[in-house]
Amino acid sequence: MIKAIDKESINNICSGQVIFDLSIAVKELIENSIDAGATTVEIRLKEYGEEFIEVIDNGSGVEPSNFVALTMKHCTSKLESFSDLLSIETYGFRGEALSSLCSLSNCIITTRTKNQVTAQRLVFDKEGKIQTQTPVAREVGTTVQLSNLFKGLPVRYQEFKRNIKKEYAKLLTILQAYALISTNTRITCYNQAGKSPRSCVLSTTSGSTIRDNLINVFGTKMSQSLDEFTASDSLFKVNGLISKIGIGSGTGQSISNSSSSSSQSSSQLSSSSSSSSSSQSSQLSIGSLSRSCADRQFFFVNSRPFEHSKLAKEINSLYQSFHKRGSYPVVIFNIEMPTNNYDVNVTPDKRTIFIQKEQQLLLLITDGLKTMWETAQSVFDTNQLGQFTFNDENENDNSNNNKQSKISSFPNLYTLKTEEDENNNKITTPIKKHSTTTTTSSLNSPSSNKKSSNSTSSSSSSNNKNNRNNLEEDGDDSFDITDQQPLKRAKYDGNYNNSNKKPELPKTPYPNKKKNNENEDEDEDEDNYVQPVFSNVNKSKNSSNSGSSNSLDDIIDDNEFISRSNGNSSNFMDDFEFKGSSNNIGSSSNGIKLKTISNNNNSNNSNNSNKIIDDINKTIDKMKQQQQPQQKMGLNDDGDDEEQQKQKQQQQQQKRKQQQQQQQIEEEEEETIDGYKQKNSKTFDITIKTDLNTISKQYLIRNGTFDKDNNPIIPNTALVVSNDDMVVNNNNSNEFDQNSIITTTSEKCCIVDKSIPQLDGKFSTSLGGIGAKQQQKAATQVTSQLQQQPSQTNQKTAEEELTKFFKKEYFKQMIVIGQFNLGFIIAKLGNDLFIIDQHAADEKYNFEILSKSVESSINSQPLLKPDTLSDLTSEEELIIIENVDLFKKNGFKFIIDHDAPTRFKIKLSAFPIIHGQSFGIKDIYEWIFMIKESSIPGSVNKIPRLNSLLASKACRKSIMVGTTLTHKEMKDVLNNLSTLDNPWCCPHGRPTMRHLVDLSIKDKLKQQQQQQQQKQQQQQQQ
């Protein structure tokens, strides 16, 4: 017999369907608060919601006339008829939530409107009827208190208590969704566990945008890792945030269409500006923030949270095609559409929504994301040269020797060192085998073994200034190398000459300055040895007296390096001065002694060396004539008060004393490199690079106008200057100009140290009179000012400073500099320096070539006996029948019998063989699954395993790491990238290129320095 169910049972049955867990109970209360216009919503939980739930808001409140109907079933003020659902704009509309909460818990509501003097506290029974009503004090708004949730349902209550932590975690996820989308609304959640004080688990500050709320909910780091996304058509408008892909610049940040940069010169990188997905966080270089699960993906329809598995699946699949498999993006998308285009009345929790023209929405989002991410791959964060630092020399030398990298494509690839290099920077200069450019000590002169206590080793720079300026005018950077610390050497005793004698390096003391007295210097103990540059110097014992390149080949090994690091003072290329202390620079000298190591006849080398010696001696004579009593730059000159200057000098002497004590401690720590015991020797050596003709040819190579294969560069002479052989006679002055020691020879270009720790001991100041630490501080201030410039401008300017938009066509215009570590190509475009992965670049080229040739390389292999696919279900058979042309295009051929029973309709008659690899039944099953899971018809148009096969084949036939490339081969790699559809990453996800440094910062630093000099001069004049 059919009978009507009693009201209490109906209440419990229906209420249990509407409120089925903790998160839905709190969600309904939050939606009521937001619908009431609340700008502050506070959620309070006790024992994670098991004992007590309270939601407090400052909304409009409930009018007294609505108290009775407030908790009645299907009573609402938000719609009157079913047709109103097509225009509903509020979260709630069915009038079921409060009635169900009253049935499942103890419910108390306290509310007040702006027209009431006091609030009313309403206690409801299980049927939603008011039991008691009392006036209480409260501001305008509503408070809903729930206790003992689900206690009337024994099974559900026990399940609720047992899984309370899971319920609580699910609640927080839903709270995060509302906190993100509710702009200009402050949402706060507190929880009190046991007797401990309550803790805030979520809080927003009524942000005006989703990104503001995101920072409050998930932190700044996540905000910096998300790009803004916008896509729209005539029906839909999508706004939100999504993870960067992390390709190209390491951040994958998106920019506008390339048309924004079309007006700029094609030879320079275009600066990114505003876009459909402009990244406000692009000032900070934070990489892609992918997750191992899709736990932070939030979708909204007109600001209503909902779940859409198809949309999430398409986004995740597309993201993994750009990033890597198993990674999921953070997604926050709000889809705006007309209210009559979707149906929210599908499930009790309203989190499932049916959307008209769903395929159009999916295509809009996927196409927009694909375009954005493809563009983002060509955006590179620019690394300012002032931020480019090297490893400190105090690191473990053994590990450094094992990990040193070398630039090897050309015999001489110069280490770039510019004015803005800061203190403690390290330069690694490679020594190539079969290259005669090397560094050693020339100490064979008896007079050079010991010097007076006042003499100090100094350095000279003999770069041809006119030629350097010409290079700079052509858009290239100067080749100046600034060596900062003495070279590390292994202990070895002997003297190296082009004779029958075995190469030896004699013991050489150097002046160890003691600071007890400013003018007191004493020679260091004889056990401080000059150590040879090359670690395996024992090989040189077999060198012949012919001076041929074989002797150098025996001495120099491929993997040997000379490391230098800055001393106590930073340096700039131009307008650089040393100001001496009360100690004069040297007492007597015969000039500078040079030594040559040649691979040609000795007569030619001696003539070249004599010319350089004459030029250097002439330069020293000019230097003596240009002595000036005043500091030219005066960066630390606060006035003419001599007492202040003396005090500053005393402070500087104390600082140098501490520094030298630290150096003496470091000297006692012996190290072992390549089997030789080493000390941190304070001797100073000067590396002199090759001749000007070689540099000119090198410049032509770097600019793509010189063929290395047809005209290889072999340096004629390697010149060496010893610290003890080079003494400047400057008795009558305590200052000299660095520019005056640059030689004007047209035969050779000498590049030497500009800053020496020993000179810091002799000279009280450098760089126009500032001390080492002051100088470092000044350089740091210059760099920091340049780094802070973007923050002083608007957002658009900041993004333009920190991002570069790289077009594919630029690859053809790049100038090959050389090969680094036998694995990377260094190339230059304008003022920007890039590093290209030779293997990834060639692999991507081969992959796209193979992909384009797939259709022509598919061979269908017929079967003698067609194979019945009896494991197929009726659904899978239908998928094959509907996509039979797609299967046939990829080499699969079927015999279909529509009259046969299920599981016997389809027989495989031929399978494809592509590039020697056959595909079979397993590939058919996998392909069927991919087609079934795809939300967009025709999106899976290739055999799933085909891409991995082509990627593996392309990898094996590509240029491998460790392969030496010629200039033409490197240029071909770059030219090939310009022809690709997507040249930014290889099929396995490795980026093909990174931005190394923007060299234009050098000019900014120089300009900043000049401005400071002008200010100091103005202060002195005043």
Curated annotation (Swiss-Prot):
Q: Which InterPro entries match?
A: DNA_mismatch_repair_CS, DNA_mismatch_S5_2-like, HATPase_C_sf, MutL/Mlh/PMS, MutL/Mlh/Pms-like, MutL_C, MutL_C_dimsub, MutL_C_regsub
User: What is this protein identified as?
Assistant: Mismatch repair endonuclease pms1
Domain of life, per UniProt, equals: Eukaryota
Q: What does this protein do?
A: Component of the post-replicative DNA mismatch repair system (MMR). Heterodimerizes with mlh1 to form MutL alpha. DNA repair is initiated by MutS alpha (msh2-msh6) or MutS beta (msh2-msh3) binding to a dsDNA mismatch, then MutL alpha is recruited to the heteroduplex. Assembly of the MutL-MutS-heteroduplex ternary complex in presence of rfc and pcna is sufficient to activate endonuclease activity of pms1. It introduces single-strand breaks near the mismatch and thus generates new entry points for the exonuclease exo1 to degrade the strand containing the mismatch.
Q: Where is this region: Disordered?
A: 251-282, 390-527, 622-676
Q: Tell whether Cell cycle is among the UniProt keywords.
A: yes
A GO-annotated cellular component: MutLalpha complex
What GO molecular functions are on record for this protein?
Answer: ATP binding; ATP hydrolysis activity; ATP-dependent DNA damage sensor activity; DNA binding; mismatched DNA binding
Keyword Cell cycle among record annotations: yes
Which compartment or compartments is the protein found in?
Nucleus
Name the residue ranges with Polar residues bias: 403-412
Its assembly, as annotated, is: Heterodimer of pms1 and mlh1 (MutL alpha). Forms a ternary complex with MutS alpha (msh2-msh6) or MutS beta (msh2-msh3).
* Sequence similarity: Belongs to the DNA mismatch repair MutL/HexB family.
Q: Which PANTHER family match?
A: DNA MISMATCH REPAIR PROTEIN MLH, PMS, MUTL, MISMATCH REPAIR ENDONUCLEASE PMS2
| Keywords linked to the UniProt accession | Cell cycle, DNA damage, DNA repair, Nucleus
| Main localisation | nucleus
- SUPFAM superfamilies given for it? ATPase domain of HSP90 chaperone/DNA topoisomerase II/histidine kinase, DNA mismatch repair protein MutL, Ribosomal protein S5 domain 2-like
* Compositional bias (Low complexity): 436-469, 647-664
Q: Which Pfam families match?
A: DNA_mis_repair, HATPase_c_3, MutL_C
Instruction: Give the GO biological process terms.
Output: mismatch repair
